[in-house]
């Protein structure tokens, strides 16, 4: 029997609102969709911004986010499909190896330990939240100018501004630092996994996703890679996002899940 439940996992600097269009589309395809917020993020965007700097946010860790989603998944009546974006993509990789899902899709996945690049756009985009010169307990705001470069670099200005105002929230510095030591068991068998990259992504370059994908070559488990031309890091909210979503749904159907 095919799974009809999808759990969406958002990434850094956003909450579950970023999945609004995906949830609607997948529901029309007959899926039950859950898009939980990270701990403490189940508030309106304007409230999350107003609360900056939120000391509770400053102490949020990747481990806590993972357990939050693991606990949610364990309450379901069937193993779900999990789809994550950015740090949510890394969460998919980590949860999949715990056998908590029937399949996973990691979109623009943040790199786990052992996957790195010296590409300038990656270093420039990630330095503000991993710099050792600022306390890890200090939450960070995403400025509009930084959002333009890291998430929506090819969007028209009006669309950049609209996306920033609708979706962007402050973030914990601990989470990206935790990802540097997040261990993915690349040799371990796992349910089907699809890694997706955007060719115009500055913060998580497509070459980095390819390196992530290549690490799985020593396992016989199904691991696939797809690069979408012209897509930025905010591929899930970019024009023609439906093309990406439909590709994923077709892939899931092909894999029998």
Task: Describe every region a protein language model picked out.
Residues 11-14, 199:
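Active-site glycine-rich loops that stabilize anionic/oxyanionic intermediates
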Residues 27-52:
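Conserved alpha/beta-hydrolase
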Residues 63-80:
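Conserved acidic catalytic loop of the alpha/beta-hydrolase fold
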Residues 83-88, 92:
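Gly/Ala-rich beta-loop-alpha elbow adjacent to hydrolase catalytic centers
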Residues 100-134, 174-182:
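Flexible "cap/lid" loop of the alpha/beta hydrolase fold
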Residues 189, 195-197, 201:
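Short beta-strand/loop motif that positions the catalytic acidic residue
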Residues 205-215:
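Short alpha-helix in the alpha/beta-hydrolase fold that links the catalytic acid
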Residues 222-257:
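Catalytic active-site module of serine/aspartate enzymes centered on a nucleophile-bearing elbow/loop
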């Amino acid at each position: 029997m095919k799974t009809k439940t999808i759990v969406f996992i958002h990434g850094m600097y956003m909450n579950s609102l970023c999945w609004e269009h995906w949830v609607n589309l997948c529901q029309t395809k007959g899926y039950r969709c859950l898009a939980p917020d990270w701990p403490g993020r189940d508030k309106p965007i304007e409230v999350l911004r107003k609360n900056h700097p939120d000391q509770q946010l400053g102490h949020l860790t990747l481990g806590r986010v993972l357990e939050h989603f693991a606990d949610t998944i364990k309450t379901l009546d069937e193993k779900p499909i999990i789809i994550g974006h950015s740090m949510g993509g890394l969460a998919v990789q980590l949860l999949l190896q715990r056998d908590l899902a029937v399949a996973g899709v990691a979109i623009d996945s943040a790199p786990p330990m052992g996957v790195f690049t010296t590409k300038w756009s990656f270093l420039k985009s990630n330095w503000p939240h991993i710099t050792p010169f600022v306390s890890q307990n200090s939450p960070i705001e995403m400025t509009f100018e930084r959002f333009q470069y890291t998430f929506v670099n090819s969007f028209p200005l009006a669309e950049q501004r609209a996306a920033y105002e609708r979706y962007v929230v402050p973030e914990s510095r601990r989470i990206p630092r935790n990802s540097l030591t997040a261990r993915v068991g690349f040799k371990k068998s796992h349910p089907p996994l699809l890694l997706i990259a955007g060719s115009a992504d500055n913060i998580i370059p497509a070459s980095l996703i390819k390196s992530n994908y290549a690490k799985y070559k020593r396992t016989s488990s199904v691991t696939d890679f797809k690069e979408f031309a012209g897509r930025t890091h905010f591929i899930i909210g970019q024009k023609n996002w439906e093309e990406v979503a439909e590709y994923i749904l077709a892939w899931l159907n092909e894999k029998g899940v």
